[in-house]
Amino acid sequence: MRRLKSDWKLSTETREPGARPALLQARMILRLIALALVTGHVGGETRIIKGYECRPHSQPWQVALFQKTRLLCGATLIAPKWLLTAAHCRKPHYVILLGEHNLEKTDGCEQRRMATESFPHPDFNNSLPNKDHRNDIMLVKMSSPVFFTRAVQPLTLSPHCVAAGTSCLISGWGTTSSPQLRLPHSLRCANVSIIEHKECEKAYPGNITDTMLCASVRKEGKDSCQGDSGGPLVCNGSLQGIISWGQDPCAVTRKPGVYTKVCKYFNWIHEVMRNN
């Protein structure tokens, strides 16, 4: 693997949109993403396997979190300055890309922001981020608000949890194969269903709490995978889950993906945004 002289250092080109011409900004985004794809830098512990290419901009709340050249995690836009992602994705700062579809091309819909403020759940075990998955939820506050367009829109939160059997959708730029890494250029989607909590507990004995939920289409082996962490599980038009963890290799029969159950954190999310 070719090694860069150093991680991609964001210089004056990383100022907020408007500080540079649109063309220069677009080139910067392309360079950032291209470096990540070429070097294979994909972050996040979790596991879209056997999905399909999303219709362009059909998931306008989808966010890509980068750290320098590294595709760190997915995230979900929930307010003009706020993202929701997994706590195990936490870093000191992020480059945030919104309005993306094909990471090798620009279509004028892209927006970029920076963020240095993260608010992981206070009960998340940061000393064991890849082993203890309880309370794997975090808010990220961007340095400036985004502009809502057809390609950039927030996703609704709901205090009501969904029932087993509900059809949902997951999305991300994570690897499309496992255990080998194969990174897609375009955003991938997969249709999954919520699984009974007892079945989830049987799949991962002793590791499932009431703030987690499982989803998959086990007959077809669909699942989220590396690089998808922090991304959305969308059910009935609302954010019901955050991609958190699962079996490695991904999409193994009888081993569903595990998600943070967002409805259980509805009050906490709004409290953090209100106080910050």
UniProtKB/Swiss-Prot annotation:
Pfam family, one: Trypsin
Keyword annotations: Disulfide bond, Glycoprotein, Hydrolase, Protease, Secreted, Serine protease, Signal, Zymogen
Disulphide bridges: C54-C189, C73-C89, C168-C235, C200-C214, C225-C250
Keyword Hydrolase part of the UniProt annotation: yes
Residues carrying a glycan: N125, N191, N207, N236
Cellular component terms (Gene Ontology): extracellular region
Record-annotated active site: H88, D136, S229
Range of residues in the leader sequence: 1-44
GO biological process: proteolysis
Annotated tissue distribution: Expressed in brain and prostate (isoform 1) and prostate (isoform 2).
Keyword DNA damage included in the entry's annotation: no
Molecular function per GO: serine-type endopeptidase activity
Main location: secreted
Domain of life: Eukaryota
Propeptide: 45-47
Subcellular location: Secreted
InterPro entries per UniProt: Peptidase_S1_PA, Peptidase_S1_PA_chymotrypsin, Peptidase_S1A, Trypsin_dom, TRYPSIN_HIS, TRYPSIN_SER
EC number, UniProt record: 3.4.21.-
EC class: hydrolase
Domain Peptidase S1 residues, every copy: 48-274
Function: Possible multifunctional protease. Efficiently cleaves 'bz-Phe-Arg-4-methylcoumaryl-7-amide', a kallikrein substrate, and weakly cleaves other substrates for kallikrein and trypsin.
Family from the record: Belongs to the peptidase S1 family. Kallikrein subfamily.
Protein name per its UniProtKB record: Kallikrein-11
Organism per entry: Mus musculus
